[in-house]
Amino acid sequence: MNLKLASSPHELRTCLAGRAFVLVPTMGALHEGHIWLVDMARRCNLPVVVSIFVNPLQFDDSLDLDTYPRTLEQDLEKLEGKAFAVYSPSVETMYPNGLDSIRIDPGPIGRILEGAIRPGFFDGILTIVAKLLLQTAPERVFFSKKDAQQAFLVRRMVRELAFPVRVEVTGFLRDKFSLPYSSRNRKLGVDAREKAQRLSQGLLSVVNNGPLTVRDCIDKITDLANSIGVDLGYAQILDENFCEIASDRMVTRAFHSEACIGLNTPLFLLAARVHGVRVVDNVDLVVV
């Protein structure tokens, strides 16, 4: 199978020739976690299209945008034999009237956690996902639970705006030291990577020594972040609807499953800066 490359909706339609397909949106700099998501999408027995577009609206820091890795040639090599086509449009194709265009408001849930730290972040996410869905018209679209808040908001947008597409939310991969795969991990030095790994390991083992209250779990991770010198952006436990859980309820289990499908359990979500590099993580919880 020869991987096809399209840079416009017309080129993509020509490649697909009327076939139904599934879409995996990415910003490129593909890693093992992306490839695993593509493999999950292939289980649908439909052609897989991977979009690669570094979306300017998602960045509140111009330096972060400028330094975000762009590795199209390497990405194409990784997708050969796995995807049917890559859709890699230009900024002008996605935003023909410039970046000061109509945006989709994510609502209150888009202004907590990542949305509180990065104002406008989810406006950018939802706007580009909506544009991709309208331009490409997939049968299904795949997202990783690693970015759980993003997946939740996309799923809600699709439902409320009646997009004719099914949103699939899958589990995600971790490396052998428990750190979730991320394109930004390549920016981590040896010391920073070790700290990020310790944070993820702490999240996974938060109730290994017995049940704790929601408040105690958050305090435990906060103390860990402080002890290893990590700048914690947030550490919060929310239910499957991204609502707060009473602080005196008990957490009896924290777990990670690559095979987990959907967003149907409470989550312990955190974000931190480790030597200036953003890391995000979450684990599923059993809360009683």
Curated annotation (Swiss-Prot):
Binding site for beta-alanine: 58
The organism of origin for this protein: Tropheryma whipplei (strain Twist)
The protein's name in its UniProt record: Pantothenate synthetase
EC number(s) from the headed UniProt entry: 6.3.2.1
Recorded superkingdom: Bacteria
Biological processes, Gene Ontology terms: pantothenate biosynthetic process
Protein's pathway: Cofactor biosynthesis; (R)-pantothenate biosynthesis; (R)-pantothenate from (R)-pantoate and beta-alanine: step 1/1
Family: Belongs to the pantothenate synthetase family.
GO CC annotation: cytosol
Catalytic activity: (R)-pantoate + beta-alanine + ATP = (R)-pantothenate + AMP + diphosphate + H(+)
Record's keyword terms, sorted: ATP-binding, Cytoplasm, Ligase, Nucleotide-binding, Pantothenate biosynthesis
Binding site for (R)-pantoate: 58, 150
Single annotated GO MF: pantoate-beta-alanine ligase activity
Catalytic residues identified in the record: 34
Other comment: The reaction proceeds by a bi uni uni bi ping pong mechanism.
Pfam families (alphabetical): Pantoate_ligase
Record InterPro entries: Pantoate_ligase, Pantoate_ligase_C, Rossmann-like_a/b/a_fold
Cell compartments where the protein resides: Cytoplasm
The keyword Nucleotide-binding is annotated on this UniProt entry: yes
Function: Catalyzes the condensation of pantoate with beta-alanine in an ATP-dependent reaction via a pantoyl-adenylate intermediate.
Binding partners and assembly: Homodimer.
Transmembrane segments: none
Annotated ATP binding sites: 27-34, 173, 181-184
